Amino acid sequence: MNILMLTFIICGLLTQVTKGSFEPQKCWKNNIGHCRRRCLDTERCILLCRNKLSCCIYIIISHEYTQRPAFPMIHLEDITFDYSDVDSFTGSPVSMLNDLITFDTTKFGETMTPETNTPETTVPPSETTTPETTMPPSETATSETMPPPSQTALTHN
């Protein structure tokens, strides 16, 4: 039983090691030559392969070797793009932010004058407050028990 297992292991390893050497080695440009010890009469030796083998190339190229077709020429004039949606999309393709939007850099209360392009500070008008407008009427608190906020600030100082 041990000899049988050892035989299977050796056969498995041999097939893994020698897979590349079962077919003849190719050489020269686009693998049109074969590595052999001695070239045939219809072949010519061009250079040497490994292990003292000659790279033999047929004198007359046979039809069994098919060359790759040349790549088709692409004329840039024939390529057209559809620019119909250029006006509708103004953002960047990554962030999808609109490039036409500008952010307002002025502070609150400042306006930009178009003549000089300088910020002007405007103070909002002060509102006059009365106790009736600041204090809403309620059932629990009356105006006598709780003074308006402007009077409480003056009395606690």
Curated annotation (Swiss-Prot):
Compositional bias annotation for Low complexity: 110-145
Region (Disordered) location: 109-157
Gene Ontology terms describing biological process: defense response to Gram-negative bacterium; innate immune response
Signal peptide: 1-20
This protein's GO CC annotations: extracellular region
Disulfide bridge positions per record: 27-55, 35-49, 39-56
Pfam families tied to this protein: Defensin_beta_2
The keyword Disulfide bond is assigned to this record: yes
Compartment annotation: Secreted
InterPro entries recorded: Beta-defensin, Beta_defensin_dom
Keywords, alphabetical: Antibiotic, Antimicrobial, Defensin, Disulfide bond, Secreted, Signal
Function summary: Has antibacterial activity.
Similarity-based family: Belongs to the beta-defensin family.
Protein name (database record): Beta-defensin 125
Organism expressing this protein natively: Gorilla gorilla gorilla (Western lowland gorilla)
Lineage: Eukaryota, Metazoa, Chordata, Craniata, Vertebrata
